[in-house]
Amino acid sequence: MHSNLGLAGLAGLLATASVCLSAPADQNITSDTYCYGQSPPVYPSPEGSGTGSWAAAYAKAKNFVAQLTPEEKVNLTAGTDANNGCSGNIAAIPRLNFPGLCVSDAGNGLRGTDYVSSWPSGLHVGASWSKALAKQRAIHMAKEFRKKGVNVILGPVVGPLGRVAEAGRNWEGFSNDPYLSGALVYETVDGAQSVGVATCTKHYILNEQETNRNPGTEDGVDIAAVSSNIDDKTMHELYLWPFQDAVLAGSASIMCSYNRVNNSYGCQNSKTLNGLLKTELGFQGYVMTDWGAQHAGIAGANAGLDMVMPSTETWGANLTTAISNGTMDASRLDDMAIRIIASWYQMNQNSDSPSPGVGMPTNMYAPHQRVIGREASSKQTLLRGAIEGHVLVKNTNSALPLKSPQLLSVFGYDAKGPDALKQNFNWLSYSPAIQENHTLWVGGGSGANNAAYVDAPIDAIKRQAYEDGTSVLYDLSSEDPDVDPTTDACLVFINSYATEGWDRPGLADKSSDSLVKNVAGKCANTIVTIHNAGIRVIGDWIDHENVTAVIFAHLPGQDSGRALVELLYGRANPSGKLPYTVAKKAEDYGSLLHPSLPETPYGLFPQSDFDEGVYIDYRAFDKANITPQFEFGFGLSYTAFEYSGLRISNPKKSPQYPPSAAIQQGGNPHLWDKTVTVSAEVKNTGRVAGAEVAQLYIGIPNGPVRQLRGFEKVDVSAGETTQVKFALNRRDLSTWDVEAQQWSLQRGTYRVYVGRSSRDLPLTGSFTL
């Protein structure tokens, strides 16, 4: 890493979250010069090394780029218009048989086209806690992208991580925990790219709110994008962590975000791009802007930006001019082009790939070629994925599974299907608290997807009723419906919506809560299903004696109803666990409930100070000793599991810092050295088979009480016992040393906790380093 700051000066800047200095307290500053220097400069931009599995792709790319004219190199670095419906395009170079690139939304399935599937969302996969599911979903989903001529998936999402409870895009990512997010993004990147489609992991980095995410104008006054101000320790231990796992898995591209980081825009921040991503993590692919996130010309290129989407007004011929006048090295343009072409070769897209955009019509309602993306082989993964992301959080007196009901009463707006499915479904110009006209199976914005169909809960319930001879009464519009007193169960469906572009107006809504309470006041067996695009607090009615069962159904995709009925009737056993903490009341999230808003003196340059450090979600609840409604990692089953036999291996003797080594993709390879192995036994003590997520938490000296550092989802037959093992590597047991700029093992006693959730940990032990 090269910088014009010495190590001591660098560490000083990074030790605490950055803020603008010496600003007047009583009036808005009108220049961001107060904020200069808060993000350390790191230059030059390192060239891709072609390390490890990238060697062959880099050799081919260098040969390819050597044949390009300056104009052709420049054209690779910015999007262009094309006669297709791709989100973005890179122009072809016909004389060298390069067909161009089609990049398209998004990480939860293709958007804006036909003959594709609506997959379970990232949050839904996070709630499954299944690495195997994450990989299979990625494989089958990527096959649809490939058949439709998409070279690059604009996903998966690990930013936002979920710092702000009301953040509008938390549903696109996997979890509020970096370890869980990192494990699932690794499988997602690995799975998608195994079928020859590149991933663009996003949004890098600290894109933790939608409010003021972009610069804007209010009453004719320019307002900058919000600045996420963070210290180096928190950056590494929380927000960079899952991106490191994505790079380790070989993500071909990283999308830089709209926001500023320590008062430097994310797509021209040399510290995050040159320093962290390309130097420390050894990233071999290319950095792509989010749409319209370019705010600088040559400065952005020098800071590590490689590709602008969807087009550029500041690069083009200006890049070659900059090389001519010496403000940019020719090697930087070469590296940009090499990284892009190397990723194309790395995905083997030079061989037998569909034409870019072949199945992406500009208008689905105009004549176009039929290109089928869906495959019959995906059906099992679609349904399994939909099932496993449901989390059962209450089940009084075994209300579920249903037992041959004679009469079911169904209530709530969320039970019914949509009136229409369109090309850009669920892109709204505002963010309502709920989708009151139909069931919620996906969130809004660019992360939405196109469904082949939507199996709504009421439709699936009717099909099952036909098979069983059950009567079904329903009222899907009233807030205070009539209830037949002889009904076996009342099924109430509500939702909680979220979308790109807006943060949520709250974590609950009065009309939905009133519906639940009104039904529960008349029905002794009220079962509530919530399709939630993020945290939903339910303290208003969760303790009602007639609310017997509650399911967080998240965003299951097109097989929503079918999956739910499998669970309601016991043909599938709930196995999901919460990937976030549900508070008893919204105020328990404290300062991390709402997004940061512009305040004097920074009204024109909004600031969001990450002063809480690593203490978000369950770490914050543990630190403040707040009892949640349902803790991180919690989820019920139709059976029960018993834990025993904790074993901890003797730790491998290791120096405080990892030995020096050539940086590979993912960083210093010694970070992955195995240090300790923990094992335990899980017994199914119930009468039916089920799947349990065994969770390992570590208490690192001088750190939070507990941090997730392992999980395994295991299927266990009734009465059977299985062993789970957790292999802990050096990074798992380290904290970030801001002075040494290294991951550091701590000297002292490490606490070990194994169990069902972050607060139900029957097995405890320790080891010493």
UniProtKB/Swiss-Prot annotation:
GO terms for cellular component: extracellular region. Disulfide bonds: none annotated. Its EC number is 3.2.1.21. Glycans are attached at N28, N75, N262, N318, N325, N437, N546. It is an enzyme of class 3 (hydrolase). It is found in: Secreted. This is Probable beta-glucosidase M. GO terms for biological process: cellulose catabolic process. It comes from Neosartorya fischeri (strain ATCC 1020 / DSM 3700 / CBS 544.65 / FGSC A1164 / JCM 1740 / NRRL 181 / WB 181). One of its GO terms (molecular function) is beta-glucosidase activity. Pathway: Glycan metabolism; cellulose degradation. Residues 1-22 form the signal peptide.
